Amino acid sequence: MIRSELIQIVADENPHLYQRDVERIVNTVFEEIIEAMSNGDRVELRGFGAFSVKHRDARTGRNPRTGEAVAVEAKSVPFFKTGKLLRDRLNGKED
């Protein structure tokens, strides 16, 4: 599913909302998640999961073609941990 499909589904399920308003809401939700993570905050959506930032230390990697050692800089990467409700649903354990 892509963002436009999500917007369409939400708009279809909420006929009292205009599609452009749904689009603004969805975009705002994503922007707020991105902003919080940019500040190093964790974003938890109960039952769905939690978005957080993991820090990777600098390390020495290898160029796969040449085998030459390469310095890999420290970096921050997004991380998502699924919530119990989502995990259970994916594994067919719905209530």
From Swiss-Prot:
Domain of life according to the entry: Bacteria
SMART domains: BHL
Keyword Nucleotide-binding among UniProt keywords: no
CDD domains for this protein: IHF_B
Assembly information from the UniProt record: Heterodimer of an alpha and a beta chain.
Protein name, per record: Integration host factor subunit beta
Any Gene Ontology biological process: regulation of DNA-templated transcription
An example Gene Ontology molecular-function term: DNA binding
Keyword Transcription in record: yes
TM stretches of this protein: none
PANTHER family recorded: DNA-BINDING PROTEIN HU, INTEGRATION HOST FACTOR SUBUNIT BETA
